[in-house]
């Protein structure tokens, strides 16, 4: 079975090579090739999953060594894959949700002339993400990490004819460079202090402690903080979150892939996989929980003010990943629940984004929710599937988000002390805000009056406009209609996961028992009972829904956004994150550049030019001595001899 692990990666990687290098001859079938190879990878994942289930809980680790990558004396870096319970969970999520997104994209990108290339990029994304989660060492993980960054750049900027898309791709790439630098430094520190960066020796396993278990706390803290910086970049956590909203410039299937199953989950995987390092660095764990708590509130507040349906969901993604990071920062109490919420989030967030794409498909690519309204009558399948995803994300009792989010809130309170109360309160507040902004999205899109009938001009921001439609210069009023079967079938499958995944994982604590041999698990002493936490969570959800209903359900939604409060205006601008970056980083960089230019011109060039001028002046004076007269040379010789005699007499006198 070990030999099948490489095929997991090889299938989408082969698809990427064939589609990107095959040329226009594959335009007619390229999308099906990409979808088929993604599905093949999923089937292989299911086969390997069945094999792991047939093994004992402590024997569910398969490794496949391919070749030695960097063999030098005293050191060896291997290309090897590691399949255990944690990586298996990600494999099924990546390939399963990824295959559904491929199928959805067949219809969604039907009229795009570059569809073959798009599917090549999707396959490349899957292959890179699979390398990331299957790597047996941090160096190979870094290869997958960078591959994900490259593929996201290509997908976000897929419509590069739009300046906004090109800028968004560049922004995502550059912001992630900061996080990537953290990962590279962390790997260097591991090699410096441990002499290796393979998972087995560093992290341990199978009941044996790794090098991290006995390492100095200061060293572990330094490594953990660098890994956290990397996670903040890929998972769009504060302070490296500014790229996520702009990433909506890519086609909607890209948003679903990035926000649900792949890129933004990479940071959570890195933290949980490196649990042995974080467990020995309590200060770093505290920073992780703070980052998660701040981000879950940051993203939720941003989502409350967005009228662009995709950007509202982007704020939601930032917030939900914040929950996962918070749980991962709690240590063994929260690792399992972080991954559980990651999986359930993969179902309902992918479904929500695909539902948003379906709405846009039926609304001439309109993204402004103020130009929607009453669409449930025209898009019944989209309405039901989107509605189930909505109920899951707000934590409606019985649906998947209820189980996973509730467990994280319980774990936060179980942390104990003041820290536990603060983290638990932040998580509860985030639950209320989540219910508010998602109810707002639901009401503005599917309920109320049909505002699109009175919208004579298109919205100025339409990220999913094809080149022909964008340059045509005319506007056809929308005629809302349901999407074709190739788009609705993936939405239905994801809706089923949104409904049942949480309960399936929670019955008998089967998900906890599945991951516990890898992540470990411990039970904290919560100051409040699990029932009280559940009651508080449901109460927060009801409050959020009620407030949103009072504002957007009982009142007409204005076609033009009102000015709003100071917080609302700031949230529309992503809580001024770009302004902050410009003032602190860009403007500071400009001042530093000007200072360096001044130093270069005055000091560096001054020394060089001054030396040259001095040599030139001295040469000019020396040239005057060479006048061609013998008497001048005789006088010079006499003077030199006199000076020599005087110096000799002076030295003897001394």
UniProtKB/Swiss-Prot annotation:
Keyword Transcription regulation: no
GO terms of biological process kind: ATP synthesis coupled electron transport; electron transport coupled proton transport
Domain of life: Bacteria
Catalytic activity of the protein: a quinone + NADH + 5 H(+)(in) = a quinol + NAD(+) + 4 H(+)(out)
Region (Disordered): 455-479
EC number: 7.1.1.-
Pfam families: Proton_antipo_M, Proton_antipo_N
A molecular function (GO) term: quinone binding
Subcellular location: Cell membrane
InterPro entries: NADHpl_OxRdtase_5_subgr, ND/Mrp_TM, NU5C-like, Proton_antipo_N
Keywords associated with the record: Cell membrane, Membrane, NAD, Quinone, Translocase, Transmembrane, Transmembrane helix
Annotated NCBIfam families: NDH_I_L, PRK06590.1
Name recorded for this polypeptide: NADH-quinone oxidoreductase subunit L
Organism: Streptomyces coelicolor (strain ATCC BAA-471 / A3(2) / M145)
Gene this protein is translated from: nuoL
């Amino acid at each position: 079975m070990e030999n099948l692990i490489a095929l997991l990666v090889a299938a989408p990687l082969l698809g990427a090579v064939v589609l990107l290098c095959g040329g226009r001859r594959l335009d007619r079938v390229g999308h099906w090739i990409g979808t088929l190879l993604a599905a093949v990878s999923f089937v292989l994942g299911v086969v390997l999953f069945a094999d792991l289930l047939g093994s004992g809980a402590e024997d569910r680790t398969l490794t496949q060594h391919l070749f030695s990558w960097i063999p030098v004396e005293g050191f060896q870096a291997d290309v090897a894959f590691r399949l255990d319970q944690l990586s298996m969970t990600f494999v099924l999520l990546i390939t399963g949700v990824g295959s559904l997104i491929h199928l959805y994209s067949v219809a969604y990108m039907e009229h795009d002339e570059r569809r073959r290339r798009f599917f090549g990029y999707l396959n490349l994304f899957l292959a890179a993400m699979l390398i990331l989660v299957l790597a047996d060492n941090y160096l190979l993980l870094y290869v997958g990490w960078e591959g994900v960054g490259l593929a996201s750049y290509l997908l976000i900027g897929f419509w590069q004819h739009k300046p906004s898309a090109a800028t968004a791709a560049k922004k995502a790439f550059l912001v992630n460079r900061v996080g990537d630098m953290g990962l590279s430094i962390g790997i260097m520190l591991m090699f410096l202090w441990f002499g290796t960066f393979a998972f087995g020796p560093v992290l341990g396993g199978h009941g044996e402690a790794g090098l991290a278990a006995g390492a100095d706390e200061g060293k572990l803290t330094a490594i953990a903080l660098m890994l956290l910086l990397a996670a903040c970049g890929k998972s769009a956590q504060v302070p490296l979150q500014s790229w996520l909203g702009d990433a909506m410039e890519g086609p909607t299937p890209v948003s679903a892939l990035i926000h649900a199953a792949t890129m933004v989950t990479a940071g959570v995987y890195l933290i949980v996989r490196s649990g042995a390092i974080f467990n020995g660095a309590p200060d770093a764990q505290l920073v992780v929980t703070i980052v998660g708590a701040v981000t879950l509130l940051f993203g939720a507040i941003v989502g409350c003010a967005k009228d662009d349906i995709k950007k509202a969901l982007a704020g939601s993604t930032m917030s939900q990943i914040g929950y996962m990071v918070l749980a991962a920062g709690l240590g063994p109490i929260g690792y399992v629940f972080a991954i559980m919420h990651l999986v359930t989030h993969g179902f309902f967030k992918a479904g929500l984004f695909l539902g948003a794409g379906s709405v846009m498909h039926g609304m001439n690519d309109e993204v402004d929710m103020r130009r929607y309204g009453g669409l449930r009558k025209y898009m019944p399948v989209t309405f039901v599937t989107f509605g189930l995803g909505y109920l899951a994300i707000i934590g409606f009792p019985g649906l998947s988000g209820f189980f996973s989010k509730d467990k994280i809130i319980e774990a936060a309170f179980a942390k104990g002390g003041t820290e536990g109360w603060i983290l638990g309160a932040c998580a509860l507040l985030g639950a209320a805000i989540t219910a508010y902004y998602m109810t707002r999205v639901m009401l503005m899109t599917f309920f109320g009056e049909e505002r699109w009938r009175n919208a004579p001009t298109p919205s100025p921001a339409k990220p999913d406009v094809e080149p022909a439609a964008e340059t045509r210069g005319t506007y056809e009023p929308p005629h809302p209609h349901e999407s074709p079967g190739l788009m609705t079938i993936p939405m239905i499958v994801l809706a089923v996961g949104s409904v049942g995944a949480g309960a399936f994982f929670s019955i008998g604590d089967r998900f906890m028992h599945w991951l516990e041999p890898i992540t470990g698990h411990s039970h904290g002493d919560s100051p409040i009972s699990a029932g009280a936490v559940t009651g508080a969570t449901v109460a927060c959800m009801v409050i959020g829904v009620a407030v949103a209903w009072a504002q957007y359900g009982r009142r007409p939604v204005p076609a033009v956004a009102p000015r709003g409060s100071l917080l609302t205006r700031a949230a529309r601008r992503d809580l001024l994150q770009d302004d902050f970056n410009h003032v602190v980083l860009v403007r500071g960089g400009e001042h530093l550049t000007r200072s360096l230019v001044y130093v270069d011109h005055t000091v560096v060039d001054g020394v060089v030019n001054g030396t040259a001028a001095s040599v030139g002046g001295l040469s000019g004076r020396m040239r005057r001595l060479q006048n061609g007269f013998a008497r001048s040379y005789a006088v010079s010789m006499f003077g030199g001899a006199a000076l020599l005699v005087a110096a000799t007499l002076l030295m003897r006198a001394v």
